Regions:
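Active-site beta-strand/loop architecture of penicillin-binding DD-peptidases
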Residues: 1-20, 27, 36-128
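Short, highly charged C-terminal tails/helix-capping segments
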Residues: 129-137
Length: 137
């Protein structure tokens, strides 16, 4: 595993450490994983229009962090948009979190950004499959 700079040059080699068992109930983990899968594949999923037809099963969750600001210079700014997930579903090799400040809704703004990361990482040509755009969180 490695980290690249913004010009795709190797910045440093990363050595992953084994995850520590935190004692979560395996059934609870399974329920969360199924929910993340539904969010990206079920007809009612908030990012299913982005990830549902992607050739590698990606799972994740959209979000919109609401902002309450009373300062005059900050009025009118939009909510923060985010999407976090991983793939492939059955054997994850990449985790992506996209946070777009003042972006609006996660399913509309952040999920497409995350999709581009998955496309690049897995070498998937965007023209090789069809993806619709979702419009809700």
């Amino acid at each position: 595993m490695a980290r690249a700079d913004n010009r795709d040059r190797l910045a440093r080699e990363l050595v992953p450490k084994p995850a520590k068992d935190v004692g979560l109930n395996p059934n609870n983990i399974r329920v969360v994983q199924e929910g993340l899968y539904d969010a990206t594949h079920a007809s009612y999923g908030t990012s299913a229009g982005i990830f549902g037809s992607f050739p590698i099963p990606i799972v994740g969750k959209t979000g919109t962090a609401e902002k309450y600001v009373t300062l005059p210079n900050y009025q009118g700014l939009q909510d923060q948009a985010w999407w976090c997930g991983y793939g492939p579903y059955d054997k994850p090799s990449l985790v992506v979190c996209a946070m777009i400040e003042n972006g609006g809704h996660g399913g509309v703004v952040a999920a497409p950004v995350a999709l581009q990361v998955f496309q690049k990482f897995f070498g998937v040509d965007p023209s090789s499959y069809s993806a619709a755009v979702t419009n809700s969180d």
